[in-house]
Amino acid sequence: MTNDPGSTQRGRSRGATQSARPVAARPPKRPSPQWRRMDLHLHTPGSNDYQEPYISYLDILRQASARGLDIIAITDHNTVAGYAAMQKEVEQLLWLESRGRIDPLEQRQLDEYRRVLDKLLVLPGFEFTATFGFHILGIFPPETPVSYLEHLLLTLRVPPALLREGSSTVGATSDVLTAYHVINEAGGLVIAAHVNSGNGVMMRGLDFGGQTRVAYTQDPNVHALEVTDLEKRGNQTTRRFFDGSKPEYPRPMRCIQGSDAHRLIRESATSPYLGVGDRVTEVLLDEVSFEALAGVIRGNDHSLTRPYRGTAKAVDFVQLAREEGESLVQAFHPTMNQRGGHLDNILRDICAMANTNGGTIYIGVPADAKAKPEGVREPARAIEALRTTLAKRFSPEPPVQIDSLPTQGTTVV
């Protein structure tokens, strides 16, 4: 919770000879390709199975930036509602700024969006559930209108009533091959999601004919396969299976990995539920753009993608603050319960910071950096209760921005 107080041209020819012989201009030097990090399978609170519905869209972008990602795709279940909500939030802040009606807290939020989006390419998309429950990622250029993507989902027979629900179960929709074709024809990247696990088109554990599996993984309209074992080695990996060495699977398939994140940060090292940037693919690009990415994903040079094996960990901003310790601009409270005077202590700190240089108050975590934080149960409800209390107890109400942050598997305010 943050408290905020009040004409010389370059490139001339070296000269012409007396016979006016033209001098050929040198073509501009192309930038050297660089390895870029991408996570093309991220969910948001726009998916109804998202595990932390109180997380903001800005939180997700911040985490992606903190993990060193260059490209992400928002791929909620059978909807683009999450991406649309993020887009609408940014547009609203820009509108307020353009009319001089933006308050300091909103300005800080907009500035943070600008900072993150200046470094991060965010692509719209969806995770479509085809017939028999198979999952397919469709990823599109950033300028693609939300209405176009919603029309595409309707074309794929997602029921209109469920178009903004973010549900992974939407009844009888289009089959896998039709979905591949429709998404590809619409200009999207077509990636079969987590093919070697649940809802994957490898159909493990399902009694389907071999020709169906071949068609679902070799169709010319599918550009890549997302796998969960890309970093494993040996002869039994999914990438080895689809390397073109099998007569029945002659087309070598590009295999990439994505986090399929349904939460901001992985709860523990053994949890199967990954966070943003926990499974990353590196891609060699001349520039960070959808066009450059599409050129690689649709191409045949499989050496241009590889699993990212870096050791970068998610930044725990709360723990960093605890290690710095309490100060005039930083305070910690293990709980906001009224009993024991905890809420009153929080209000005193708010009042003090509002009348000085501002600061940040962390609720749900003790100041001792070695103590395990308890966190705040139902953060969204706690934030609303705190807003109500501030409105009742202060006049004028101090400018306070209240957010939730993850730390050590729990959430603080």
Regions found by a protein language model. Name each.
Residues 1-69, 81-95, 112-124, 130-146, ...:
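Charged catalytic cores and adjacent phosphate/nucleic-acid-binding surfaces used
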Residues 74-79:
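Active-site neighborhood of divalent metal-dependent phosphoester/pyrophosphate hydrolases
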Residues 288-413:
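Conserved N-terminal catalytic/coupling substructures associated with nucleotide/phosphate chemistry
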